A protein has these predicted regions:
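Low-complexity, acidic/Ser/Thr- and charged residue-rich accessory regions of DNA metabolism proteins
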Residues: 2-94, 353-357, 366, 370, ...
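Alpha-helical scaffold/interaction cores of sigma-54-like transcription cofactors
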Residues: 1-441, 448-452, 531-535
Length: 620
């Protein structure tokens, strides 16, 4: 910046003189001092998505308020630190999409089973649910569905509720950067070995005097509350000082606040007889919380939702899928992957249909058994809400018109539901008029002929002679499926390319499951997720999907720049590398990854499909 120069004052005076506003040396120095003080200060207001300030008196008498960018809304000019300094109460009211999904799932289950449930009614400590979790079979489940969580599940092997509390908390930047993950997993393995001889054996922790703080997590601090308790029990902190320590840990975007407690903590532990290496290790773990860690209470509430969603996925998969689709956008996976996963688990999914679909996804009989699921399951009928270009109001009119009587034709539907040509074309593109018009090309022809009739002619039938068109090839139908609804119930796109991929010696995700550790392999799939978390030190994680399932790819930083263009831009990616297949002690399933050595962008093989596939979900 210009004012960093050693001659900044001379430059400023010359600039001012050129503008016709000369400055003396003293005034110029004051301007420079002010400019330096303002460096790094935000110059705009960013609205908190769910922050509310509650006051006894009128808010505008206490804090400065200005109009927000959105019409009819106001925003406070102070941030949370300003409010805290003034002892004003701020409450963050944040939404979780999974809460909506669970409510919808309970509603669907009540209609199906004839009994109303809420969270408290879900059976506790269900063995089949934990078996599913330990297999990392958690697509769509709250919190434990990400790549990192799925990799941790077969290592941590949750078998009871508190294990889930730790699970949702340990895969966070704080515990990872603080070096808490491996010590905790090692402690769990030591306890597992102990319990082979005595099922009720408790693992002794290194310092029994800190048992109140550390016993429940096997001697490794995972939560902020534990650090507070150690500071009180081991280092002589008062409750107020421990709370200040917690607040400094919670301010994870502002570095350095924890260091003011370093000497007091280490000296206090030393005076209490703890070795210096323990104090150093503990403080390093505390520093990890500065990279974002969970309070235990937060982890408990998240674990409850993780368990509830896992139970429903395991025992009511049809209700669960319908609820997830109706709650989009949310979660880690797009609707196409949620549907693919549900179908692999035996759930029957029926297409959008103007003569059968509701606005939302619905359940349809007859009930049929699914392997491994106790209760017979209905099919899931995709809802009109999934049709791109068809608004909720138009979908509602369609359903309302259908309740008065079955549609005789596409023309009859358009007239009675008051749908214009664009809305009819949206239905046709989604293959939702098949029962009325036949195959998709015929639907598109019929939809193109529809014009909204003037009021006096809405009940007057008119038309022209039907034209018979040939049906579209499968590839074209798949293209339209993705463009119109974001998913397909036909074959996966890679099934159409499998013969060409086989000539490139590319294995499917299913075939890779039988490949031993260390083998050099090739895989190819549609890129569904890209991740490059800060805690991974530059490593990128990519998920590919083919017709048999997902393949997880690891890209080390040294190779990221070499293959950057293909890794960041490809929709269809072929990867060659070393197959990793490791099994944790006691784990039923291994953790599988493909470590990239080279890759190739094969997006061109998708043709026009590449332009309509939903983009990958990228996280940083």
């Amino acid at each position: 910046h210009w004012f960093d120069d050693v001659h900044a004052q001379d430059h400023l005076q010359a600039l001012a003189a050129g503008l016709g506003e000369p400055l003396d040396a003293h005034t110029a120095a004051l301007w420079l001092e002010l400019a330096r003080a303002l460096r790094g200060t935000p110059r705009h207001l960013s609205q908190h998505v769910g922050g509310f300030v509650l006051t006894e008196d009128k808010l505008t008498r206490l804090v400065p308020v200005e109009p927000a960018a959105m019409k009819g809304r106001s925003i406070i000019q102070w941030d949370k630190d300003d409010l805290d300094a003034m002892d004003l109460l701020k409450v963050d009211v944040l939404a979780l999409g999974m809460l909506s999904a669970l409510r919808r799932c309970f509603d669907a289950r009540a209609a199906l089973r004839g009994e109303r449930w809420d969270l408290a009614d879900i059976p506790r400590e269900d063995e089949a649910t934990y078996d599913m979790i330990c297999r990392a079979d958690t697509v769509g489940v709250f919190q434990i569905e990400s790549r990192a969580q799925m990799s941790m599940l077969p290592r941590l092997l949750p078998r009871e509720f508190y294990d889930l509390v730790v699970q949702v908390a340990i895969v966070r930047p704080g515990p990872i950067q603080g070096g808490m993950v491996q010590p905790y997993l090692q402690a769990r393995e030591r306890r597992r070995q102990l319990r082979k001889e005595n099922s009720k054996a408790q693992l002794p922790i290194e310092y029994p005097k800190l048992g109140k703080a550390l016993e429940r997590t096997l001697g490794v601090p995972i939560f902020q509350e534990q650090v507070m308790q150690i500071a009180i029990d081991g280092a002589g902190f008062t409750a107020g000082e421990a709370d200040e320590l917690r607040r400094s840990m919670a301010a994870w975007k502002r570095k350095g606040g924890v260091h003011r407690f370093e000497d007091k903590l280490k000296d206090g532990l030393k005076d209490a007889g703890y070795p210096p290496e323990f104090a150093d290790r503990l403080f390093q773990q505390i520093l990890g919380f500065g990279e974002y860690g969970f309070p235990e209470s937060h982890a408990y509430s998240f674990a409850m939702l993780a368990y509830a969603s896992s139970w429903l996925k395991r025992h009511e998969p049809a209700c669960f899928l319908a609820a997830l689709l109706d709650s989009q956008p949310m979660g880690f996976y797009p609707p196409s992957q949620l549907v693919q996963d549900a179908r692999r688990h035996g759930v029957r999914v029926l297409p959008v249909d103007a003569v059968a679909s509701g606005v939302d996804c619905t359940l349809e009989g007859p009930l049929a058994p699914i392997r491994g699921v106790r209760a017979p399951q209905p099919a899931v009928r995709l809802g009109l809400r999934l049709v791109a270009g068809l608004g909720r109001a138009a979908a509602g009119r369609l359903v309302q018109a259908r309740e008065a009587g079955a549609f005789a034709s596409a023309e009859d539907l358009a007239l009675r539901a008051r749908l214009d040509r664009h809305e009819m074309q949206a239905l046709a593109a989604a293959d939702a008029l098949r029962a009325l018009s036949g195959h998709r090309r015929q639907q598109m022809w019929d939809a193109a002929a529809q014009l909204r009739a003037p009021p006096l002619l809405q009940d007057a039938p008119f038309g022209e002679a039907a034209l018979a068109l040939p049906a579209a090839p499968e590839g074209e139908d798949i293209l339209f499926d993705y463009a119109a609804t974001g998913l397909t119930l036909r074959r996966h796109p890679l099934a159409l390319l499998r013969e060409r991929l086989a000539r490139l010696r590319v294995a499917t995700a299913l075939q890779l499951r039988a490949v031993p550790q260390g083998r050099r392999v090739r895989a190819c799939g549609i890129v569904t997720v890209r991740q490059r978390p800060g805690s991974a030190q530059g490593t990128m994680f990519i998920t590919l999907e083919d017709e048999t399932g997902p393949v997880n790819v690891i890209v080390w930083p040294a190779l990221l720049e070499r293959w950057r263009e293909a890794l960041l831009r490809s929709r269809l990616l072929a990867v060659e590398g070393v197959w990793q297949c490791t099994r944790a002690p006691g784990a039923g399933v291994p953790v599988r990854h493909l470590v990239l050595q080279r890759c190739r962008d094969l997006t061109g093989m998708l043709g026009r499909l590449a332009g309509v596939l939903e983009g990958s979900r990228d996280f940083h």
